[in-house]
């Protein structure tokens, strides 16, 4: 059986990347929450 996680840098960036987060209101909320928390990495 094939495992569910098949890593791909392109797919990772296109679905969870910074620019994708900034496109939607909810995504910007995620970035702001991570900024407020002091996360070193805001997005993938």
UniProtKB/Swiss-Prot annotation:
Is the keyword Transcription regulation in the record? no
Q: Which residues form the signal peptide?
A: none
A Gene Ontology annotation in the biological process aspect, one of them, is: translation
**Entries under PROSITE patterns matching the protein:** RIBOSOMAL_L34
What NCBIfam families does the annotation carry?
rpmH_bact (TIGR01030)
Q: Which family does it belong to?
A: Belongs to the bacterial ribosomal protein bL34 family.
Q: What is this protein called?
A: Large ribosomal subunit protein bL34
Q: Which gene encodes it?
A: rpmH
